Amino acid sequence: MLGNYKCVIASKSQIIDKWDEEIKRHNDSEEWKIYKKQSLSNMDTRIVYMGLLDGKIITEATAIISGKDKCMENKDDLVDNGKVYLSAFRTNKEYENQGYFSKLYKFVESDLKSKGFKSLTLGVEPKEIRNIQIYFNWGFTKYIKTGFCKYANGEVAIVNYYEKELN
């Protein structure tokens, strides 16, 4: 099933290619152009991970490793002091529910642990029941706080934040 699938720390050109693909997939959305600009302006505070199947990017995740990130909201207790904030979990639709993202997540966790980080944090909207179940299964069971997240389209969402210790 996972065949020629490999996980990598993305290069800048891979990040640009993936953003261009997402923008195209979202009908040249201004919102996605804003996300691309934010991502590229924070390259020194983030590590972008990708899963490649036969060389094609099919999964991705971003680790925000510094509170100096200019675009992260609700930073307090989520990043710095050994904590990394995980975000932008994406899997191309046709590859969902096949284990690809789980393999990428394990790669991300292992890499961040090897770099000396002590815990991982993430945020999830309360309505995303399936994702909450997955994150709890992965060990994100320590509740940190609830906050509001404003998306590029102006929408505001309630987000619950959780932490997982890396042992």
Residue positions per predicted region:
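Short hydrophobic/aromatic beta-strand element in the GNAT-like acyltransferase core
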Residues: 46-50, 60, 88, 121, ...
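C-terminal "cap" of GNAT-fold acetyltransferases
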Residues: 125-129, 137-138, 144-167
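Conserved acetyl-CoA-binding loop-helix of GNAT-fold acetyltransferases
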Residues: 91, 97-110, 137
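Short amphipathic alpha-helix that is part of the acyltransferase structural core
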Residues: 1-35
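Conserved beta-strand in the GNAT
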Residues: 50, 56-75, 85, 90
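Conserved GNAT acetyl-CoA-binding A-motif
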Residues: 112-124
